[in-house]
């Protein structure tokens, strides 16, 4: 059996100094020998998705200690992508994922912790912690802060649900008065929690359920609802049981790499496709898989996207549906249940809470006769409708569940929104290593699109062009040098896509970038173009007026320019020497921290992870 890692610091005469320090943190004589559980919290007052997490670490710690473990809490950083959006702050968002992964690894390994509870929520925090858990491969449980309630307001005489994207789009729409914009601003983000649509944060928290690393409801139970408290309490006692299983019974099946196998990643990606999750999930799943040496690639995503249907559309794809509605329809377990009925997932895999995913679905899929009364009550949890920054502050219930699988929020395969899924991988000369589009957010009329390129060397230039009416219907906006290396940091293009909507061009234009998109983006928005411009990708050679062909059903993205012309452009680019493959006339200060990130990062097709082997090749 593997020895408890913590005994490196708690046992033996030579560790008297370390034990003395442990005692100074509150460890008692009788505690030595118990498993030490690291509680990685991500509380910050900067982020609504994390503002309510301050006491969550101690809530988990309380349960750990009741179960016979020693709990030690620490914090990671957390960046709010919405606040960092549209200015230089967004350059730091994706690189923060690596910092979060490193910080968890550093704390856990430096102090020889035996197991880990990850309290995450927003965009880069869950992926960063997932990367760390696969790296460390010690017993781990994930529990997130939960989604915020959708805002509710009267807009142009119509009562409707609102979210962050509504505030952004409407603010740039001249048809709305300053007073109307202010009302929307004050109501769009009503409570603590991750933004209320199927954006990156909620997508990733849903995927932890499919990976088997969190409890049912982790991705959909509202942050404000009292039922969410049980997820934190379950995490505390479950992690102690898992630690004992591994260290005392030699049960390696409880380790992250044993749970999050290739088949589990395929389940997670199938869920993502079925629910039209954020395109960022592709980037993050690839990165997490690499940390665990799981051979999950863009080719797997392409394969799955061709036969997994779109069973659920949530904001921004469907403006009147938010995470609270997904929860009422049975949450992730209900979507997985429909995928299981269609024979599209593997339910023999273990989870942290059940011997198999199939057993979990029997208990938690509200469409099954075997679904427990506990689960049915759990999924009736409703929004409270009161602005708050306090977790567990209300206990409202819907009178009934949404079990309509024909026209409801979650559909069966026979009544799917589309026969292929909500995400697609496009290949072609413009993206030989792949690119990603959220098809759930694309209007059917533009699934095939041919247009002239309008090229911008940065997000800022694209925003100025769109707002300055430089972009016309039928054009393909190209935003380049915004990839992991070229940005650096791979900014989200939420403002360009939002402003295209504001200008009435959301269904009339396409946008292609080597950057990425917010989970709130929709429209014909194609990102993650690989290779990126800064590494010699063809996107760097596109010129304004070139014809671009996009065919989502055939998974094609093509620059329709003669090979001889492309070869000539390539030669002229190479002739620039040190200035080659760099943006022209872009004035952007780049800090040393970002330069270090750019020096080691890979492109989006590899998850934009660090490749330290680059140092050996220099």
UniProtKB/Swiss-Prot annotation:
<dbReference type="GO" id="GO:0009099">
    <property type="term" value="P:L-valine biosynthetic process"/>
</dbReference>
<dbReference type="GO" id="GO:0009097">
    <property type="term" value="P:isoleucine biosynthetic process"/>
</dbReference>
<dbReference type="InterPro" id="IPR037237">
    <property type="entry name" value="IlvD/EDD_N"/>
</dbReference>
<comment type="pathway">
    <text>Amino-acid biosynthesis; L-valine biosynthesis; L-valine from pyruvate: step 3/4.</text>
</comment>
<dbReference type="InterPro" id="IPR020558">
    <property type="entry name" value="DiOHA_6PGluconate_deHydtase_CS"/>
</dbReference>
<comment type="subunit">
    <text>Homodimer.</text>
</comment>
<comment type="similarity">
    <text>Belongs to the IlvD/Edd family.</text>
</comment>
<comment type="function">
    <text>Functions in the biosynthesis of branched-chain amino acids. Catalyzes the dehydration of (2R,3R)-2,3-dihydroxy-3-methylpentanoate (2,3-dihydroxy-3-methylvalerate) into 2-oxo-3-methylpentanoate (2-oxo-3-methylvalerate) and of (2R)-2,3-dihydroxy-3-methylbutanoate (2,3-dihydroxyisovalerate) into 2-oxo-3-methylbutanoate (2-oxoisovalerate), the penultimate precursor to L-isoleucine and L-valine, respectively.</text>
</comment>
<feature type="binding site">
    <location>
        <position position="195"/>
    </location>
    <ligand>
        <name>[2Fe-2S] cluster</name>
    </ligand>
</feature>
<feature type="active site" description="Proton acceptor">
    <location>
        <position position="518"/>
    </location>
</feature>
<dbReference type="GO" id="GO:0005829">
    <property type="term" value="C:cytosol"/>
</dbReference>
<dbReference type="InterPro" id="IPR004404">
    <property type="entry name" value="DihydroxyA_deHydtase"/>
</dbReference>
<feature type="binding site">
    <location>
        <position position="123"/>
    </location>
    <ligand>
        <name>Mg(2+)</name>
    </ligand>
</feature>
<keyword id="KW-0411">Iron-sulfur</keyword>
<dbReference type="InterPro" id="IPR000581">
    <property type="entry name" value="ILV_EDD_N"/>
</dbReference>
<keyword id="KW-0001">2Fe-2S</keyword>
<feature type="binding site" description="via carbamate group">
    <location>
        <position position="124"/>
    </location>
    <ligand>
        <name>Mg(2+)</name>
    </ligand>
</feature>
<keyword id="KW-0456">Lyase</keyword>
<protein>
    <recommendedName>
        <fullName>Dihydroxy-acid dehydratase</fullName>
        <ecNumber>4.2.1.9</ecNumber>
    </recommendedName>
</protein>
<feature type="modified residue" description="N6-carboxylysine">
    <location>
        <position position="124"/>
    </location>
</feature>
<dbReference type="Pfam" id="PF24877">
    <property type="entry name" value="ILV_EDD_C"/>
</dbReference>
<dbReference type="InterPro" id="IPR042096">
    <property type="entry name" value="Dihydro-acid_dehy_C"/>
</dbReference>
<feature type="binding site">
    <location>
        <position position="122"/>
    </location>
    <ligand>
        <name>[2Fe-2S] cluster</name>
    </ligand>
</feature>
<comment type="pathway">
    <text>Amino-acid biosynthesis; L-isoleucine biosynthesis; L-isoleucine from 2-oxobutanoate: step 3/4.</text>
</comment>
<feature type="binding site">
    <location>
        <position position="492"/>
    </location>
    <ligand>
        <name>Mg(2+)</name>
    </ligand>
</feature>
<dbReference type="GO" id="GO:0004160">
    <property type="term" value="F:dihydroxy-acid dehydratase activity"/>
</dbReference>
<keyword id="KW-0100">Branched-chain amino acid biosynthesis</keyword>
<dbReference type="Pfam" id="PF00920">
    <property type="entry name" value="ILVD_EDD_N"/>
</dbReference>
<keyword id="KW-0028">Amino-acid biosynthesis</keyword>
<dbReference type="GO" id="GO:0051537">
    <property type="term" value="F:2 iron, 2 sulfur cluster binding"/>
</dbReference>
<dbReference type="InterPro" id="IPR056740">
    <property type="entry name" value="ILV_EDD_C"/>
</dbReference>
<keyword id="KW-0408">Iron</keyword>
<keyword id="KW-0460">Magnesium</keyword>
<dbReference type="GO" id="GO:0000287">
    <property type="term" value="F:magnesium ion binding"/>
</dbReference>
<keyword id="KW-0479">Metal-binding</keyword>
<feature type="binding site">
    <location>
        <position position="81"/>
    </location>
    <ligand>
        <name>Mg(2+)</name>
    </ligand>
</feature>
């Amino acid at each position: 059996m593997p020895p408890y890692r913590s005994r490196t610091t708690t046992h033996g005469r030579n560790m008297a100094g370390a034990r003395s320090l442990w005692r100074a943190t509150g460890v008692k004589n009788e505690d030595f020998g118990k498993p030490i559980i690291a509680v990685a919290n991500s509380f910050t007052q900067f982020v609504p998705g994390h503002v309510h997490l301050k006491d969550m670490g101690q809530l988990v710690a309380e349960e750990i200690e009741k179960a016979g473990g020693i709990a030690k809490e620490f914090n990671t950083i957390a960046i709010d992508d919405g606040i960092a959006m549209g200015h230089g702050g967004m350059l730091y968002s994706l690189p923060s994922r690596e910092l979060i992964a490193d910080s968890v690894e550093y704390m856990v390994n430096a102090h020889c912790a035996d197991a880990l509870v990850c309290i995450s929520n927003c965009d880069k925090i869950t992926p960063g912690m997932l990367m760390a858990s696969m790296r460390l491969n010690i017993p781990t449980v994930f529990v997130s802060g939960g989604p915020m309630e959708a805002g509710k307001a009267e807009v142009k005489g119509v009562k409707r649900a609102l979210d962050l994207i509504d505030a952004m789009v409407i603010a740039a729409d001249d048809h709305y008065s300053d007073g109307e914009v202010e009302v929307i601003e004050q109501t769009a983000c009503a409570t603590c929690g991750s933004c209320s649509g199927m954006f990156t944060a909620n997508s990733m928290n849903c995927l932890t359920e499919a990976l088997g690393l969190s409890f049912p409801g982790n991705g959909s139970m509202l942050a404000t609802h009292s039922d969410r408290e049980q997820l934190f309490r379950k995490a505390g006692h479950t992690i102690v049981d898992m630690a004992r299983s591994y260290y005392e019974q030699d049960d390696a099946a409880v380790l992250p790499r044993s749970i999050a196998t290739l088949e589990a990643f395929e389940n997670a990606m199938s869920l993502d496709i079925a629910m039209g999750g954020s395109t960022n999930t592709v980037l993050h799943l690839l990165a997490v898989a690499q940390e665990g040496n799981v051979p999950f690639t863009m080719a797997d995503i392409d394969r799955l996207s061709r036969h997994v249907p779109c069973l659920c559309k949530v904001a921004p794809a469907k403006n009147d549906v938010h995470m609270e509605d997904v929860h009422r329809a049975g949450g992730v377990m209900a979507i997985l249940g429909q995928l299981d009925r269609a024979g599209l997932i593997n339910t023999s895999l273990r989870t942290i809470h059940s011997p198999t995913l199939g057993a979990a679905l029997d208990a938690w899929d509200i469409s099954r006769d075997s679904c427990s009364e506990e689960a049915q009550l759990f999924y009736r949890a409703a929004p409270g409708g009161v602005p708050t920054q306090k977790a567990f502050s209300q206990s409202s219930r819907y009178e009934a569940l949404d079990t309509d699988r024909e026209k409801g929020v979650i559909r069966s395969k026979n009544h799917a929104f589309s026969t292929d899924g909500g995400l697609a991988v496009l290949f072609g000369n413009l993206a030989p290593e792949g690119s990603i589009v959220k098809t759930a957010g694309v209007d059917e009329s533009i699934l095939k699109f041919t247009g002239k390129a309008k090229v911008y060397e940065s997000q800022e230039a694209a925003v100025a062009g769109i707002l300055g009416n430089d972009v016309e219907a039928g054009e393909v906006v190209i935003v380049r040098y915004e990839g992991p290396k070229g940005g650096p940091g791979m900014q989200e293009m939420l403002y360009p896509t939002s402003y295209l909507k504001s200008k009435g061009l959301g269904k009339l234009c396409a946008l292609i970038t080597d950057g990425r998109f917010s989970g709130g983006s929709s429209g014909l928005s194609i990102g993650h173009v690989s290779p990126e411009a800064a590494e010699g990708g063809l996107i760097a050679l596109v010129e304004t007026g070139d014809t671009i062909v996009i065919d989502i059903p055939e998974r094609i993205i093509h620059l329709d320019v003669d090979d001889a012309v492309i070869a000539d452009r390539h030669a002229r680019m190479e002739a620039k020497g040190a200035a080659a493959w760099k943006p022209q006339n872009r004035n952007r200060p780049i800090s040393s921290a970002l330069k270090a990130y750019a020096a080691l990062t890979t492109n989006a097709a590899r998850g934009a992870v660090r490749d330290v082997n680059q140092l050996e090749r220099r």
